[in-house]
Swiss-Prot record:
GO terms for cellular component: cytoplasm; cytosol. The gene is AK1. Monomer. This is Adenylate kinase isoenzyme 1. NCBIfam families: aden_kin_iso1, PRK14527.1. The lineage of its organism: Eukaryota, Metazoa, Chordata, Craniata, Vertebrata.
Length: 194
């Protein structure tokens, strides 16, 4: 199946640190605009639990703590996008690209992004939100030390990506310090113009 038809879709990369609220904003965008939300993490987990050949290979890679090859991630994104191409009004690609090369490969194999939404919350805010989430989520990676490490990794990886797309003029930065609705108002002001 050709990726040709994906070129006419709106494709939005959503980038934001852990605790920035990007998951919540993605849900609201899906609800209001009829976009399809694709998270690379969810796709990988679904593939593993499907028990497919690809899933078994992925499980072995992830159990070793290694990074899943870029080609595999792109194939999964492309398959998921093509499966929804006829019914979706657009795509939110969540947690991708994590580096400039991933963005370039995405364009080569799939299509160029329409926008990059940068859900930007300050470090303090993200730490606070994650600690609060940790009280109820039971997620082992929601303790302060791990959180600070995750944020460091996130900033290191994301800054060049943001700079790359700023150079193209497609970054829309959201001040994610406000309430969910305040942040969503900013989102709408950008998406309504597309």
């Amino acid at each position: 199946m050709s990726t040709e038809k994906l070129k006419h879709h709106k494709i939005i990369f959503v980038v934001g640190g852990p605790g920035s609220g990007k998951g919540t904003q993605c849900e609201k965008i899906v609800h209001k605009y009829g976009y399809t939300h694709l998270s690379t993490g969810d796709l990988l987990r679904a593939e593993v639990s499907s028990g497919s050949e690809r899933g078994k290979k992925l499980q072995a890679i992830m159990e070793k703590g290694e990074l899943v090859p870029l080609d595999t991630v792109l194939d999964m994104l492309r398959d998921a996008m093509l499966a929804k191409a006829d019914t979706s009004k657009g795509f939110l690609i969540d947690g991708y690209p994590r580096e400039v090369k991933q963005g370039e490969e995405f364009e080569k194999k799939i299509a160029p992004p329409t926008l990059l939404l940068y859900v930007d919350a300050g470090k303090e805010t993200m730490v606070k939100r994650l600690l609060k989430r940790g009280e109820t989520s039971g997620r082992v990676d929601d303790n302060e030390e791990t959180i600070k490490k995750r944020l460091e990794t996130y900033y290191k990886a994301t800054e060049p990506v943001i700079a790359f797309y700023k150079g193209r003029g497609i970054v829309r930065q959201l001040n994610a310090e406000g309430t969910v609705d305040e942040v969503f108002q900013q989102v709408c002001s950008y998406l309504d113009k597309l």
